[in-house]
Amino acid sequence: MAGHSKFKNIMHRKGRADAARSKLFSKLSREITVAAKSGVPDPNMNPRLRLAVNNAKAESLPKDVIDRAIKKSQMGDAADYSEIRYEGVAAGGVGIIVEVLTDNKNRAAANVRSYFTKMGGNMGATNSVAFNYDRVGQVSYPAKAASEDDMMEAAIEAGADDVVSDMDEEGEGHIVYTAFESLNEVAAALEAKFGPASNTKIAWRPKMQVPVTGDAVATLMKLLDALNDDDDVQAVYSNEEISDEDVAKLG
């Protein structure tokens, strides 16, 4: 799994380097607006909004931008966004789930489909990939936040289901998994002990990994990059496992 984690981290750094910071801020702002519109515009009374605001703060989204995104949800001319899940199979048999937040369903569907097609993949029907994933709550902390033992102990006390710690320099740090119904309670308990998380969300966790080697690795990465770079795409989940050797070839 080490190669898999490092591969994800390389993608993460590459995405940050290649994508404009404003694009990330736009996605965070959109989630805040939709979350506020789905309930009351008060993070203390709206769990989804609270998560969106906390994640935005973790990414250093300015407070005035957060406030504007919340106010925008209460305006009569605020765009109506649709939340859509697309699923497909990529090079090497990797199953991908794409979560979209869009004000134009036709545009989003056409774009996502084109990415899969151009990169040798195929779009699938709803649940054609999701059955290989679990819907979970996920709380992430950097490795420096705690030792493996301390994070495990705190997670167990908080009622979490599992902890994966990757303490390598290029690793993903601590990822705490919990039932999605318990996410807010677990996140609050961990925050009381370790401070704010780097990310807290409802996520898709793969039940099994699909080994990917050779040329399929680069093709897969191009697809994942294209999906993550799309303005309508909020999150992408995939179940590839890649060796350290193949990761090194990516440069």
Swiss-Prot record:
GO terms under cellular component: cytosol
Gene3D superfamilies given in the database record: 1.10.10.200, 3.30.70.980
Phosphoprotein listed as a keyword: no
Pfam families xref list: TACO1_YebC_N, Transcrip_reg
InterPro entries xrefs: Integrase-like_N, TACO1_YebC-like_2nd/3rd_dom, TACO1_YebC_N, Transcrip_reg_TACO1-like, Transcrip_reg_TACO1-like_dom3, YebC-like
Gene Ontology terms for molecular function: DNA binding
Protein origin, superkingdom: Bacteria
Keywords attached to this entry: Cytoplasm, DNA-binding, Transcription, Transcription regulation
Record's subcellular location: Cytoplasm
Main localisation: cytoplasm
KW Amino-acid biosynthesis (keyword) present: no
Biological processes annotated in GO: regulation of DNA-templated transcription
Similarity field: Belongs to the TACO1 family.
NCBIfam families per the UniProt record, alphabetical: PRK00110.1 (NF001030), PRK12378.1 (NF009044), YebC/PmpR family DNA-binding transcriptional regulator (TIGR01033)
Protein name as annotated: Probable transcriptional regulatory protein Caul_0780
Organism field: Caulobacter sp. (strain K31)
